[in-house]
Amino acid sequence: VAASGSTNKAQTASALADRIANGVPVPHVLTRPETDKGSRMIEIWTQAALDAGQAIMAVHKAGPNVSYKNDCSPVTEADQRAETIILEALARNFPDIPVIAEEAVSNGAVPEIAEQFFLVDPLDGTKEFIAGKDDFTVNIALIRNGVPVAGVVYAPCRGQAWTGEDRNAEKLTVSTEGAIEARHAIRARRRAASPVALISRSHCTAKTEAFVAEHGLKDCVSVGSSLKFCLLAEGVADIYPRFSRTMMWDTAAGDAVLRAAGGRTLDCSGRPLAYEVKGEGEDALANPDFIAEGMTA
């Protein structure tokens, strides 16, 4: 069953921007799938993400102390606290699955990777977090044979989370205490007559602007972090072009949610974005340019 298709298509870019800025939920009529073993696994990751979000919000309220990594990107105590919480939860529940986590990699800890591994970004959108905006997220994804098969994204400042696995995607409403209050299934929409494009708030490039102009994308909304994937998955936007550097942990969880909702993420050759670690160091974990989108047919 399509989710509020006609209403979504009628939204203007300014109205969408207001809804996004205010964290207004979009109603859907899909029912929640039955819980199976995979769902029970993702519930564990979801709880880890919620716990990490609580730690992040504690730092958010107190005001973050900012330091800088070797690549000059910012890092805060919130990043480090959140990652510790997630790594402990994953090690306790899934000790045999290796984890690639952003802050650990920055400190030189890259585990041996098997066919299955976790990708963790404890705080995606650190710049937005430091600036006092609300579009930062906690991200946990499971990769199997290069494919993001399941993921959870949590936006603690908005009280919203998204999960995706095996063609089932959900949006969760979360209390300020980190408890799940409601959940409903979501689905990406087919491309609207006037498509809405989501653009990185902090990394919009000349190549992105050229793509927008070439494809006649007149309705563009700037959004930070992996929220862009989740908004595509919800069916409130249509396309997210990314032509600047991202790392696998930035995209995997949101990509998993989008794929579970019926969307897709393609590299510039038209192949599904692959999460395959080739080579050594951080460069081996970098993504190529990509385009994420909702349903195309």
Label every model-predicted segment:
Residues 115-117, 149, 218, 238:
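Conserved acidic residues
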Residues 140-230, 277-297:
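Acidic beta-strand-loop-alpha-helix segment within the catalytic core
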